[in-house]
């Protein structure tokens, strides 16, 4: 993980509740909503999906805002994005998130090609954002 500059490091106080946007409102999103209730340091506040009806349904079910992907990426209130898209989209979505100025947590795999994964790591390091992917959810 890249070292964080003072501005970004200050956003990681122990008392901060991170506001998170979710991209990809399929079945795995349900797992994140169920699991996130056990944590007090982040709150999912909005969702987006290429299928706007799926985003609207998810937003209504979990009482959050439904947005387009562009709206989510441009939302200054959101600190980080959960990338829950299909594996073939992980690279492109994570790249857009990093370029929009947000931290990103991606479902596995980080990318479908090793070189694309290395590119994301380099971009996160260059932009000084956290890029995370983990096999175990909670």
Language model regions located:
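Beta-loop-alpha module in the N-terminal Rossmann-like domain of NAD(P)-dependent dehydrogenases
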Residues: 64-123
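Short, Asp-centered acidic motifs that coordinate Mg2+ and/or phosphate
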Residues: 46, 57, 79-80, 130
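Rossmann-like NAD(P)(H) cofactor-binding subdomain of soluble oxidoreductases
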Residues: 89, 109, 132-138
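General small-molecule cofactor/ligand-binding pocket signal
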Residues: 45, 65-67, 132
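Short beta->alpha linker loops
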Residues: 50, 115, 137-138
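Rossmann-fold dehydrogenase core element
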Residues: 119-136
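N-terminal Rossmann-like dinucleotide-binding module
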Residues: 2-62
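Short, well-ordered coil/turn segments that N-cap beta-strands
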Residues: 42, 102, 129-130
């Amino acid at each position: 993980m890249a070292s964080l500059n003072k501005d970004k490091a200050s956003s990681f106080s122990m008392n901060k509740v991170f506001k998170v946007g979710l991209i990809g409102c399929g079945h795995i999103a349900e797992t994140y909503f169920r699991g996130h209730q056990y944590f007090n340091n982040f709150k999912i506040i909005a969702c987006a999906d290429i299928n706007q009806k799926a985003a609207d349904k998810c937003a209504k079910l979990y009482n959050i805002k439904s947005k387009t992907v562009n709206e989510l990426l441009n939302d200054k209130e959101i600190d980080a994005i959960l990338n829950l898209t299909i594996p073939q989209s992980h690279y492109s979505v994570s790249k857009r998130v990093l370029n929009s100025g947000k931290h990103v947590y991606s479902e596995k795999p980080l990318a479908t090609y090793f070189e694309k994964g290395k590119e994301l790591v380099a971009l996160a390091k260059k932009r000084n954002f956290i890029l995370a992917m983990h096999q175990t959810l909670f």
